[in-house]
Amino acid sequence: MDAFRRQASKLRDQVAKQQLAVIKQFSGTGYESSDVMVIDELEMQRHHQLDKLYRSTRSAKEFQRDIVKAAEAFTTIGLRHIEAGTKLSEDCCRYGNENSQNIDENILAKAAAIYGDARKHVDKEQEDFNKLLASQVLDPLRAMVAGSPLEDARHLAQRYSRMRQEAETHATEVSRRQARVREAPIPENVAKLQLAEAKMQELKANMAVLGKEATAALAAVESQQHRLTFQRLVAMVEGEKNYHLRIAAILSDIEAEMVTEKQHKESAPPAIPTENGSEKTSYFLAEVIHPFSAASEKELDLDKGDYIVVRKVSQTGWAEGECKGKAGWFPMAYIEKRQRLPTTNFAAEVY
């Protein structure tokens, strides 16, 4: 009966250990942490170092995946920007072409044509940025996440972890055999103890070799992870910075060209209307108070002090007149109305 109880107790212990091992295998991270000293202090330090390296490489791998996901999202958004930008560019160019007959007078058609042509450069910058993300960020990080050096190093650490668990279990077995020899030092118990101790020595030797190999492999992978990920992160930041700078420069040029066209239209003299016999024009004399340089053939050069015969005044602030035998347009703000010429000598200059 006692032998049966001991056998049942031993069976329960074995089942409990197996259940614990299964739970650890499926609930753990791949490398099991433990504060139990299996062999000595040196092995304990290596175990803690491997645990730290395993967690560090796993964290770096997850961070690399996060960067890859972000870069993939940037690329997808960029493709949508290109699609929307291409459609807008086509719409702007079409509107400008449909209203090209009077494009100099239609500032909206002119602005649409300017933006439609320049928008192609914006889309080209987006394409270049997407290519940079693929070659400088996505491809290198994907290769490292799925690379064999990382997996090989982690497998070594996992093998060491399993071997350490085996050694921890076997150390308990050695202690049990030692206690049994003390209780009954018969040859059979002594032989079993010697076998258990020999196996323990073999486990210690194998752990020493495997521990060094796993530590070196994980340390090398950790260093490579940090170095490569830092380089790819810097490349992504630099590429995004340059992308936004070039986009800003293109948009600044577009804006400046639009504003210039608007200012030119607002400051340009009005078109000369077709006159008919029934139209009456009021003439008056004016003196130039500010010099004016003509910017086109329709405009008139003026020097301060000149006298001019004003023939037409438009609602845009421009006037048409004649001075020194030449006719053209000029800003009304540059002249003042006079009742008569100061001397007869000036009359010849006017006409």
UniProtKB/Swiss-Prot annotation:
Q: What SMART domains does its record include?
A: SH3
Q: Which domain of life is it from?
A: Eukaryota
Q: Where in the cell is it found?
A: Cytoplasmic vesicle, Clathrin-coated vesicle
Provide the free-text tissue specificity comment from this protein's UniProt record: Detected in all tissues except seedlings.
Q: Which GO cellular component terms, listed alphabetically, does the Swiss-Prot or TrEMBL entry include?
A: clathrin-coated vesicle; cytosol
Q: What is its main location?
A: cytoplasm
Pfam families from the entry? SH3_9 (PF14604)
Q: Where is the SH3 domain?
A: 281-340
Residue span, BAR domain: 31-267
Coiled-coil intervals: 1-21, 193-213
Alphabetical keyword list: Coiled coil, Cytoplasmic vesicle, SH3 domain
Per UniProt, subunit arrangement is:
Interacts with FREE1. Interacts (via SH3 domain) with DRP2A/ADL6. Binds to SH3P2.
State the protein's purpose. Answer: May be involved in the recruitment of DRP2A to the accessory protein complex and in the negative regulation of its GTPase activity.
Name by which UniProt lists this protein: SH3 domain-containing protein 3
From what organism does this protein derive?
Answer: Arabidopsis thaliana
